């Protein structure tokens, strides 16, 4: 049986500066066009953009068979 060599430690991720995500304008024409196709009404629009309200019904997770 051949002898096992030493396993060196691999190069880990460098802990440099993280790149910040650019601030996205949710009112830009491209965002509005996207919202036009995915939202069905104003409440849905606000929900998709992250503006939830306290009494909102919870969505069903997964699909039922």
UniProtKB/Swiss-Prot annotation:
Composition bias type Basic residues, residue spans: 1-20
S-S pairs: none
InterPro entries: SMKR1 (IPR037760)
Chain intervals for the UniProt region annotation (Disordered): 1-24
The protein's name in its UniProt record: Small lysine-rich protein 1
Gene: SMKR1
């Amino acid at each position: 049986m051949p002898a096992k060599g030493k396993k060196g430690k691999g190069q880990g991720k460098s802990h440099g500066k993280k790149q910040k995500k650019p601030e996205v304008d949710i009112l830009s024409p491209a965002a509005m066009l996207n919202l036009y196709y995915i939202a069905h009404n104003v409440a849905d629009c606000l929900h998709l953009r992250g503006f939830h309200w306290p009494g909102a019904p919870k969505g069903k997770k997964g699909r039922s068979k």
